């Protein structure tokens, strides 16, 4: 980042982080969201994604269904604290979200077309940070809970991934 190197990403699992301009970094045990620069290209080979561990695909699914809580949290922050709120990313996510949820079992079984839906919505969610200039599009209270687990569970950390923790916090 500091050297401003240009990079591209070749995805091995569906994930919204590939298309964001931020990075969650642990610094002295505390998670911080830092500004990063965007990849010049993000490439998704659905055959590769269909072979990723099922647990990671489920984590990606969980990390995008948090849209419901993130949107409500962000809107409440706007109404109560006058923070900026932009609904545009949610209009874009709505184009695919219901179909993705209906295809959850097909995603779990590695169906290429269903994985394409998950991948598309993950990319859109990540890209939402580019035109809103905030991670609020898909990261609010549920992500805070996940980061809290990572920072403070120490020896009793359950070994769950970020997406798994976000999914549980969303429920």
What are the residue ranges of the model-derived segments?
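Active-site segments that bind and position negatively charged phosphate/pyrophosphate groups
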Residues: 91-171
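A glycine/threonine-rich phosphate-anchoring loop and its flanking beta-alpha core
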Residues: 6-96
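Short Gly/Thr/Asp-enriched flexible loops that form oxyanion-binding sites at enzyme active sites
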Residues: 1-4
């Amino acid at each position: 980042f500091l050297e401003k190197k240009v990079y591209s990403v070749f995805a091995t699992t569906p994930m919204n982080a590939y298309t964001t301009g931020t990075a969650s970094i642990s610094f002295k045990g505390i998670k911080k969201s830092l500004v990063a620069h965007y990849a010049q290209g993000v490439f998704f080979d659905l055959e590769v994604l269909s072979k990723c561990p099922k647990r990671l695909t489920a984590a990606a699914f969980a990390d995008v269904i948090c849209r419901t809580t993130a949107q409500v949290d962000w809107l409440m922050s706007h109404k109560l604290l006058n923070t900026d709120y932009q609904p545009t990313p949610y209009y874009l996510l709505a184009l695919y979200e219901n179909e993705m949820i209906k295809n959850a079992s097909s995603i779990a079984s590695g169906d290429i077309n269903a994985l394409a839906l998950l991948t598309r919505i993950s990319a859109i969610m990540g890209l939402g940070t580019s035109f809103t200039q905030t991670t609020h599009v898909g990261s609010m209270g549920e992500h805070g809970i996940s980061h809290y687990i990572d920072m403070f569970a120490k020896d009793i950390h359950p070994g769950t991934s970020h997406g798994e923790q976000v999914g549980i916090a969303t429920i």
